[in-house]
A protein has these predicted regions:
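N-terminal loops that bind phosphate or other acidic moieties
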Residues: 2-117
Length: 117
């Protein structure tokens, strides 16, 4: 399962770095940030490329920082043409829980359900 963290600024990069400090290096865990000099369209294009570069059959789970924020909206706009799971309001404990679920071979859907409980 590929996990893609998306945020305002460098929050997602810091989140990924912190998670890897806690649980070790992670494959298929990437971070994207929306910076003031970028447009939402540019971020959306990068995220779509990340989706398209994912091997067929591999699940994708997006983690975003803020409900209805621009990164959230960019991810949601991609749901029209792509199938993936999405959790918003992400923080370090939640991201660690996602990684632990991945270690336990849980599906993206199982991880999302567990977090919502």
């Amino acid at each position: 399962m590929k996990v893609i963290a998306v945020s305002h600024g460098s929050y997602s990069k810091g989140l990924v770095d912190s998670v890897q400090m806690l649980v070790g290096e992670q494959e298929s865990l990437v971070a994207y940030g929306l910076f003031p000099e970028q447009t939402v369209a540019t971020l959306t294009e990068k995220l779509e490329k990340e989706i398209n570069d994912t091997p067929e059959g591999e699940e994708i789970l997006f983690l975003t920082d803020l409900f209805h924020g621009s990164p959230f909206n960019a991810v949601v706009s991609l749901m029209r043409d792509h199938e993936f799971h999405h959790i918003t309001g992400i923080n370090i404990p939640l991201a660690v829980e996602v990684m632990m679920g991945r270690y336990a071979d849980k599906s993206a859907e199982e991880i999302c359900r567990g977090i919502m409980e």
